[in-house]
Amino acid sequence: MSLLNVPAGKELPEDIYVVIEIPANADPIKYEVDKESGALFVDRFMSTAMFYPCNYGYINHTLSLDGDPVDVLVPTPYPLQPGAVIRCRPVGVLKMTDESGEDAKLVAVPHTKLSKEYDHIKDVNDLPELLKAQITHFFEHYKDLEKGKWVKVDGWDNAEAAKAEIVASFERAAKK
């Protein structure tokens, strides 16, 4: 089955499917699923020797303000394979701006059917402070050595803001 056929979720915006592009703690390689073929491409080798602190992916059939599907960070006990689809629930959003404009990153935890480990996390403020600091630090610096690129982290927002972003981006994609 092509990744293009993966639905956005079971019950938006509370129950979503995230297509993983980059595993947690992986080498500094940015992968992206091509939105036309469904194939996993190497987007670039990151100049900064850093690794993603969480699994990184997107929600299919959504369109964020940067013109791409909504980005999602998924903390898990083990790194996930690129191309894997994981059922999640959103708990927050990291608000960011980069050289292309707004670039929010949702944070979602594995659905309770996959792991009870995250049941107590209802909102971004329930995440470990160290994890939030690692995520913030990563996104503040991962483009530091790329000429003409920059990132400004604008702060964290709650689960309701994440759900609102999912609904808005799903509606945006449906209109396109």
Swiss-Prot record:
The EC class name is hydrolase
Instruction: Give me the residues that bind Mg(2+) 2, please.
Output: D71
Q: What is this protein called?
A: Inorganic pyrophosphatase
Q: Name one GO cellular component term.
A: cytosol
Q: CDD domains under this entry?
A: pyrophosphatase
What reaction does this enzyme carry out catalytically?
Answer: diphosphate + H2O = 2 phosphate + H(+)
An example of a Gene Ontology BP annotation on this entry?
phosphate-containing compound metabolic process
Xref: NCBIfam families: PRK01250.1 (NF002317)
Positions contributing to Mg(2+) 1 binding: D66, D71, D103
Entry similarity comment: Belongs to the PPase family.
Biological source species: Salmonella typhimurium (strain LT2 / SGSC1412 / ATCC 700720)
| Subunit structure, as described in the record | Homohexamer.
Pfam families assigned: Pyrophosphatase
Cofactor dependence? Mg(2+)
What keywords does the record list, in alphabetical order? Answer: Cytoplasm, Hydrolase, Magnesium, Metal-binding
Function as written in the Swiss-Prot or TrEMBL entry: Catalyzes the hydrolysis of inorganic pyrophosphate (PPi) forming two phosphate ions.
Q: Which EC number(s) are documented for this chain?
A: 3.6.1.1
Does Signal show up as a keyword for this record?
no
InterPro entries referenced in this protein's UniProt entry, alphabetically: Pyrophosphatase, Pyrophosphatase_sf
* Entry's localization field: Cytoplasm
Residues annotated as binding substrate are: K30, R44, Y56, Y142
Gene Ontology terms, MF aspect: inorganic diphosphate phosphatase activity; magnesium ion binding
